[in-house]
Amino acid sequence: NGKTQTTAPDVSNTQVGVSMFGLDYRYVNGRISSRGQYISATLSDTEAYNVAGSKDIGSAMMGYYLEGAYNVLPIENKQKLDLFVRYENFNTHQETAGSLVANDAYHRNEMTYGFSYHLANGAVFKADYQSKGTAVDGADNKGQINMGVGVFF
């Protein structure tokens, strides 16, 4: 009969519209590379959704990142070892609607330091350290170590 035992609020009569704009760039010159992205989104009818579902979705969001990398291996090698640094800033409460007050904990920034070892075309091993913070005064930054293997074709 389609019924479930969920205790989640019923938000089936609310619809949130999304309009998004983004810019992306990539630059490579010899051993140096850089990339970045900027995204801005506006959401409509968030006030009705927030009231119906006891949620706190912002009506506008914004985020960007900038990354720079340097390949420390000789340029003629097929393998690459990129040392990189990346800064990210994103705010999912850039704007809020109705009585919802912007939550500074949703305005986050991250600094990432790491390396990408490109074993062959389409295969990479990555490791990095991330320091994560928010716009909340006195909030403790959190750090984490990430490792992964990527395969692409």
Q: Which positions does each model-derived feature cover?
A:
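Outer-membrane beta-barrel pore domains
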Residues: 2-153
